[in-house]
Regions:
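Compositionally biased intrinsically disordered regions enriched in Thr/Gly
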Residues: 7, 11-226
Length: 226
């Protein structure tokens, strides 16, 4: 059964006022069955901004279409694959696609959050991916990493050096690959960030600089340090 559900909203001060943007959280969920066995579970959260700037409409449409595309992937890819696996005798069910939203900072003009997708199609581990997004909610503009740091000209170099130093001086550098300085340089992507009240958090994909057991590596860069 498929259903779309409005779950919650976040709004500064808890109310909606002129010039203020609220973030609504919607859910698409559908479970897929074959011969009485639940073979796929699809659970997708996506954001919608309620505000006055027309650019927010384009963002909302983008987030909605991304959610529908993921749901279609459950229907057209995961479900046929799961049915085939079931018919071949596999007992590893259900396959799963779970997409969550975590709001990390909201001010009168900035909303920062990340979406995290977990995809399981059998095997020892599922695949987890994370996408960061920071929006100027007054204009609809998607903000960039260096917009929030002091050293805008050399901010990426400063951040990479900061991350390498954090790993080197951490309690257990062994949770990262031995050649982490080279890997930080090679796999750093400036779009992989979100904001908190303390600073910018930069993250790396699984396996980029550390084994799967480490999880998604994250590094807090205080606003005053770069």
């Amino acid at each position: 059964m498929l259903y779309l559900k409005f779950l919650s909203y976040v709004c500064i001060g808890g109310i909606y006022m002129d010039g203020l943007t609220c973030i609504k959280r919607f859910e698409i969920r559908e479970d897929y069955y074959y011969a009485g066995v639940k073979v796929v579970s699809c659970h997708i959260f996506y954001p919608q901004f309620i505000g006055h700037h027309p650019a927010l409409d384009a963002l909302n449409n983008k987030y909605y279409l991304q959610a529908i595309k993921k749901k279609d992937n459950c229907t057209n890819v995961l479900y046929p694959d799961a049915v085939q696996a079931l018919l071949q005798g596999s007992k590893v069910f259900p396959y799963e696609m779970i997409v969550t939203i975590t709001l990390t900072l909201q001010t009168n003009e900035i909303a920062s959050f990340y979406q995290q997708e977990y995809l399981y199609t059998g095997g020892a581990n599922g695949q987890t991916t994370r996408i960061g997004q920071t929006i100027n909610t007054l204009t609809g503009e998607v903000k960039h990493l260096c917009d929030f740091l002091q050293n805008k000209k050399n901010c990426e170099t400063c951040i990479k050096n900061n991350i390498i130093k954090q790993i080197k001086t951490s309690d257990d550098p062994s949770i990262y690959f031995d050649n982490y300085p080279k890997l930080v340089e090679e796999t750093f992507h400036p779009q992989n960030f979100y904001l908190t009240s303390e600073g910018v958090v930069v993250f790396f994909a699984l396996y980029d600089i550390a084994p799967h057991s480490t999880g998604i590596p994250t590094f807090l860069i205080p606003y005053s340090q770069c």
